[in-house]
Structure formats: structure tokens, C-alpha cells
UniProtKB/Swiss-Prot annotation:
Function of the protein: Essential component of the TIM23 complex, a complex that mediates the translocation of transit peptide-containing proteins across the mitochondrial inner membrane.
GO biological process, one term: protein import into mitochondrial matrix
Gene name as annotated: scpl-4
Bias kind Polar residues: ranges: 137-153
Protein name: Mitochondrial import inner membrane translocase subunit TIM50
Compartments, as annotated in UniProt: Mitochondrion inner membrane
GO CC terms in record: TIM23 mitochondrial import inner membrane translocase complex
Topology in the lipid bilayer: Single-pass membrane protein
Annotated transit peptide: 1-22
Origin organism lineage: Eukaryota, Metazoa, Ecdysozoa, Nematoda, Chromadorea
Length: 456
């Protein structure tokens, strides 16, 4: 066999196998059979290829004739050859081959029709329903209320034994928890209710000694002390006694909040957390600082936060005392300043703040001013300094009536400036009235001949 024949035979085998493979039922669509009829299902419509086969006729050499062979007959295909003129004998061979192949195609069974998509979906639905029923039966079986398995005596006894075992474990756990709680309570009372002892180990007598319930009284007193530590100020006397002679003790005490009155906290991505100093703060401290007033910073901020801020802007030491959050009274979630613990005469104490809740224990001593939010064009401290200077110059024995009067306005410093301008205008008018009257008298005297009386 020549090389050309071998290559043609391999090529035909490859195409025949490919057609048979993709014509099988395994490659049918899941959506069902095609609506267009398959031309290869009808044996009468089979098309035949015409491979060329060499035939020896009357010893005249190789004569090529075309023999029609069904495409789907066998996996092997016949090699194709160029067509030549047909001989009468070739026609007989062709007719016989056609009859044989027609009989084979007619006797071969028709390909099975693949199931449709609706049938597959119905079967899938049936299988899912069966799985759901099986899962439901497994779930309801342990409950003991229904199911065929629970009707058996062995399963019922097992369920009852499990219930009794769980009940016993629950009872034992409750007893252990109750016993641990009792032991813990007794240990707590014994530790915190014991009497204090000195360095030698002797018992220190207190007001609860000799009582059968002394440990409980001591525990209640410990809770009270802890509450006072959190709620009440750190000490009963927040400021030391006034300066004795020959030192100069200012007559009036100014208690002022730090946050949003003198400085404003601000946080940015670039600078982080910092405090802005209010405009004219240095002038304000120069006016009200020692020896004019006894200035006390009383802030709700912690000492670690507020103390460095105060030291940064008070380099001249014009502020005498600093009180922080530990010196406030915690009431209803708010830090309240108790001025009665300042160890000063409240008739001469001026408390400046923007929050009315901070001075709710002593509202008559409070001068409420607007909150400063970092506006650098603000000049309220200048007006407030003039107001406090006026109070100092008035030398009043009780400043509370003046504070109550100005506290009725939203901005006391602004109202004071308005009244100061008004009084200055009134004084200017009073100064001008005597001059006008004297000029009128001199003019009228000259007019009516009374000059000699004026000269006399």
C-alpha cells in the first residue's frame, strides 16, 4: 500500500469516528429532542459517500469506480480515489452493494429518543420530595411525640433514661452553684467585715464593735466610703485658709472654668489634640490676676490634661489655685462644682461658667457667659475684664445681687458694655449742661443790661 492510500484511509477513519461519536445519544441536549427531524433517522433518506475503489477489469490496469457506502456503516472508511469512466461491471457491483447496505440499515434498530427536559425536572422534583420526607422523619424521630421508631419499647426506654439523666445533672449543677454562692458570700463578709488591726495585731475598736451584725455594718460602711470616693469631692476643704497678715489676701475670689471659657479643645488629623487660647486671655489675666482678685481654676477636666495647659498660658503665676475633676461632685452624670467647700465667704465669690448644671448647687454665685467655640475674632474677655474691674472698684460687701442681675442676660459682658456706653453718654451730657446754662446767662445779662450784677 502506497503512502497516499494510507493517508487517505486514516483521514476517512478519523472523520467517520467523529461523526459516529457526536451522533450518539450521550450528546443529546438536556432540553429535549430537537424539533427539526433528524435526516439520518429515516433509512430511506440516508446519503451515501462515494469512495473510489480500484477494480481490475479485463486486465486493463487499475480502473477506479465509485461505490456508495453508508456513512454510519462501520468505523472504518474506504479510501477515496479519483473518479474514472465507469464500466458495465462496476454498475453491477454498485447495485449489489446498495442492496446490502439498505438491508443493514432497515434491520438496524432506531436510536432511542432522549428524555425531555420536563421529564427530567419531574424526576428531580420527586427525588427532592423524597429527601425532604426522609429529613423530616429523622428530625421528628428523637422528639418522642411521633414516628414509628418511638413506638418501639427500646427507644421509649432510652428517651426516658436520657430525660432522667438530664434532670439529675441539672439538679446537681444547681446544688453546686448554690453552694458556691453561699461559700463566696460568707468569704466576702468575713474578709470585708473584719475589724481593723494595728501594727501589733490588736483589734481596733470602732462604732460597730460589740454588735452581732458588725461585719455587715462594716461592709455597708465600706460601700458608702467607695461611693463617696467616686461621687463626692476629694476633700472637704478644697482651698487652704486665707493668707494671714502681713500678706495681702484679695477681697474677692474668682472661680472660673477652663474648658470653652479660656481655652477650646480641638483635634485635627494634622496637629492631633490641642487647645486654642482665647483672644485677649493675657489681658484678662492681667486685669483679674493677683492682687486684684484671688483667681481659682475649677475645671471638670482631669489634672493630667488641664494642669499642663494652665501652666502654658499662666507663666506669670497670676492664678493662685487649680482644682480639677477629682474636686467636683458627680451628680446625675455631670460634674458639679460645690462652692461651699472652697473655704471662702460665698458673698465674695464669683463663679464664671457657661454650663448652668455645673453651678446648680450655688446658682446665686454664678455669672453665666456664652460658650466659646474657637472663634478667633472674639473680644468677650475684654468686656468681661471691665465688668469684673467695676465690681472690684465698687467694693461691694455682697456681689451676688450684681451677679444675679447680669446673669439674666445671654451675654453679661455685652450687656455691661452697652450700659457702660450709655452711662458715658449720660455723663457727657451732664458735663455739657452747666456750660450751656452759663453761656445763656451771660448772653441774657448783656442783652438786658444785667452785666453789672454779674460783675458784682
Amino acid at each position: 500500500m502506497s503512502l497516499s492510500k494510507l493517508s487517505q484511509k486514516c483521514f476517512s477513519r478519523h472523520h467517520a469516528r467523529t461523526f459516529i461519536r457526536f451522533s450518539s445519544s450521550d450528546f443529546q441536549s438536556l432540553l429535549g429532542p430537537p424539533r427539526v427531524p433528524n435526516p439520518y433517522a429515516d433509512s430511506g433518506r440516508n446519503k451515501f459517500a462515494a469512495p473510489i475503489v480500484p477494480i481490475n477489469v479485463n486486465n486493463h490496469g487499475n480502473v477506479f469506480a465509485s461505490i456508495k457506502v453508508p456513512i454510519n456503516e462501520t468505523p472504518e472508511a474506504v479510501a477515496f480515489k479519483p473518479e474514472v469512466e465507469e464500466a458495465p461491471r462496476v454498475e453491477k457491483v454498485e447495485v449489489e452493494a446498495t442492496k446490502i447496505e439498505t438491508e443493514k440499515v432497515a434491520s438496524s434498530p432506531a436510536p432511542a429518543t432522549p428524555p425531555s427536559a420536563i421529564d427530567e425536572l419531574n424526576s428531580l422534583k420527586d427525588s427532592l420530595s423524597k429527601l425532604e420526607e426522609a429529613a423530616a422523619s429523622k428530625t421528628s424521630a428523637p422528639s418522642g411525640s411521633s414516628g414509628d421508631n418511638n413506638d418501639q419499647p427500646g427507644n421509649a426506654e432510652e428517651v426516658e433514661a436520657r430525660r432522667k439523666r438530664m434532670e439529675r445533672n441539672t439538679r446537681i449543677g444547681g446544688y453546686v452553684l448554690l453552694g458556691g454562692s453561699v461559700i463566696g458570700f460568707i468569704s466576702f463578709c468575713f474578709y470585708y467585715g473584719r475589724a481593723q488591726r494595728d501594727e501589733a495585731g490588736n483589734v481596733i475598736a470602732d462604732e460597730f464593735s460589740g454588735s452581732f451584725l458588725a461585719p455587715f455594718y462594716r461592709i455597708a460602711n465600706s460601700f458608702k466610703l467607695w461611693k463617696d470616693y467616686v461621687v463626692e469631692p476629694a476633700r472637704e476643704q478644697l482651698l487652704p485658709d486665707p493668707l494671714p497678715a502681713p500678706y495681702l489676701q484679695p477681697k474677692y475670689t474668682i472661680v472660673i472654668e477652663l474648658k470653652n471659657i479660656l481655652v477650646h479643645p480641638e483635634w485635627t488629623y494634622k496637629t492631633g489634640y490641642r487647645f486654642l487660647k482665647r483672644p485677649a486671655l493675657d489681658y484678662f489675666l492681667d486685669v483679674i490676676g493677683y492682687p486684684n482678685f484671688e483667681v481659682v481654676i475649677y475645671s471638670s477636666e482631669s489634672m493630667m490634661t488641664a494642669a499642663p495647659v494652665v501652666d502654658s498660658f499662666d507663666q506669670k503665676q497670676r492664678i493662685m489655685y487649680k482644682l480639677f475633676r477629682d474636686c467636683t461632685k458627680y451628680m446625675n452624670g455631670h460634674h458639679v462644682k460645690d462652692l461651699s467647700k472652697l473655704n471662702r465667704d460665698l458673698s465674695k465669690v464669683i463663679y464664671i461658667d457657661f454650663d448652668a448644671k455645673s453651678g446648680q448647687l450655688n446658682p446665686e454665685n454664678m455669672l453665666r457667659v456664652p460658650e466659646w467655640r474657637g472663634n478667633m475674632d472674639d473680644t468677650s474677655l475684654v468686656d468681661l475684664a471691665e465688668l469684673l474691674k467695676t465690681i472690684h472698684l465698687s467694693d461691694a460687701e455682697d456681689v451676688r445681687p450684681m451677679l444675679q442681675y447680669y446673669s439674666q442676660y445671654d451675654d453679661p459682658a455685652k450687656e455691661f458694655r452697652r450700659r457702660a456706653v450709655y452711662l458715658a453718654q449720660q455723663e457727657e451730657q451732664k458735663k455739657q449742661q452747666p456750660d450751656d446754662s452759663s453761656m445763656l446767662k451771660r448772653y441774657s445779662g448783656r442783652l438786658f443790661g444785667f452785666r453789672r450784677h454779674a460783675s458784682a
